[in-house]
């Protein structure tokens, strides 16, 4: 029996081999103890402030919205140490692993941002780490692979399946099944078996807490709309968390439509998947009628995932959040616009959220509204990808 709720409505659960159940129960207990341990919370707060660089700014875009009545703010997780929001929850999990006397960290990564965050936290806290990464992602994210290796991580290229994030997740879970006594599995998103979705949300909620304080200080009111990209869903649930109770705030998650929904090459399980069992949870999944997992597709490695976290599924089910999709081309266009008009280079993942914001703004330029987009990471890692794409030619 779990101490916290392990389901969000019908979504969630602990669909793992029986051998891992004691490890998950133990993790839940230690997580709850840590939250009530002043030494732990103070140490985490200190690391977030003095090591990671929190709070991150809430930046008003002054050029993109010229000649409109929209105020567009960006929550700047790209400025966090490590280059993305991943650092928030990785520091929390790494401290928890130390508290549990674990010696090694196992992780998976797609875009490499979670891998980089894992590597830097392990270097800081003296933990060994091995990081699984699909071979396709190793090729397209070579800069992040080298960053991980510089910080002492062992990066394991996964050649099984499609060689992307889902395959890295499978291998990491398999590794943990064999080494759970000495290792902690540091899941990188708000998905997986309980208690991971709840734990990751808690450590990422700092994004929403800061955003709420910042927008109230700058505008003396809440935003009309908050938009975040959705892969597994950690950056989105982090910023959504403090606004779920505010029904006046529209919450929008943006999935990757890839090369177009009709092509089948996308990563949009919320809109075009069905409920299934994957990665230790019950959630929307891209699957065949026989329950076989389909290959997802996105130009952004961090969104190239065939499922989504259970709380997002529940938020959609109850009508509290809306989920849409943006194609590769639309994301690339938004990437270029932010670079050229505001001097900010966003991650391709975040560019999906920005692209949808630009769509909303262009629909009615006279509408008075405040929109916040979570810029979940910086785009240094994506420069080579953008440079090679024909659509970037002027």
Curated annotation (Swiss-Prot):
* Gene Ontology molecular function terms on file: tryptophan synthase activity
Residues recorded as bearing N6-(pyridoxal phosphate)lysine in the entry:
86
**Disulfide bond annotation, renumbered to this chain:** none
- EC no. given is 4.2.1.20
Q: What protein family does this chain belong to?
A: Belongs to the TrpB family.
Name it: Tryptophan synthase beta chain
Q: Does the keyword Amino-acid biosynthesis apply?
A: yes
What's the cofactor?
Answer: pyridoxal 5'-phosphate
PANTHER family cross-referenced by the UniProt entry: TRYPTOPHAN SYNTHASE (PTHR48077:SF3), TRYPTOPHAN SYNTHASE-RELATED (PTHR48077)
What species is given as this protein's source?
Answer: Buchnera aphidicola subsp. Baizongia pistaciae (strain Bp)
């Amino acid at each position: 029996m779990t101490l916290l709720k392990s389901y969000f409505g019908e979504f969630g659960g602990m669909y793992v081999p029986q051998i891992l159940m004691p490890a998950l129960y133990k993790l839940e207990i230690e997580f709850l103890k840590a939250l009530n341990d002043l030494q732990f919370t103070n140490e985490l707060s200190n690391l977030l402030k003095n090591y990671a660089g929190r709070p991150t700014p809430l930046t008003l875009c002054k050029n993109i919205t010229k000649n409109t009545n929209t105020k567009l703010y960006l929550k700047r997780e790209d400025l966090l140490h490590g280059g993305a929001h991943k650092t928030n929850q990785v520091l929390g999990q790494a401290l928890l692993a130390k508290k549990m006397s674990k010696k090694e960290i196992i992780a998976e990564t797609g875009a490499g941002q979670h891998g980089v965050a894992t590597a830097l936290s392990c270097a800081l806290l003296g933990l060994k780490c091995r990081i699984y990464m699909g071979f396709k992602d190793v090729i397209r994210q070579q800069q992040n692979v080298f960053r991980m290796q510089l910080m002492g991580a062992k990066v394991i290229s996964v050649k099984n399946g499609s060689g992307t994030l889902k395959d890295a997740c499978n291998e990491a879970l398999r590794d943990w099944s064999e080494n759970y006594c000495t290792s902690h599995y540091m899941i990188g998103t708000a998905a997986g078996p309980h208690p991971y979705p709840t734990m990751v949300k808690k450590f990422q909620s700092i994004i929403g807490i800061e955003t709420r304080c910042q927008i109230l200080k700058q505008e003396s009111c809440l935003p009309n709309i908050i938009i975040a990209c959705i892969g597994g869903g950690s950056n989105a649930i982090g910023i959504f968390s403090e606004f779920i109770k505010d029904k006046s705030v529209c919450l929008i998650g943006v999935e990757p439509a890839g090369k177009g929904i009709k092509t089948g090459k996308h990563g949009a399980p919320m809109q075009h998947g069905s409920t299934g069992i994957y990665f230790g949870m019950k959630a929307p999944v891209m699957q065949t009628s026989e329950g076989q997992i389909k290959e997802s597709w996105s130009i952004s490695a961090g969104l190239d995932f065939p499922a989504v976290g259970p709380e997002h599924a529940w938020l959609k089910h109850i009508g509290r959040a809306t989920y849409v999709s943006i194609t590769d081309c639309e994301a690339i266009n938004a990437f270029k616009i932010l670079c050229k008009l505001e001097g900010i280079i966003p991650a391709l993942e975040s560019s999906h959220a920005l692209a949808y914001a630009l769509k909303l703004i262009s629909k009615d330029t006279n509408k008075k509204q405040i929109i916040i987009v979570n810029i979940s990471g910086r785009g240094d890692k994506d420069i080579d990808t953008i440079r090679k794409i024909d659509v970037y030619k002027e």
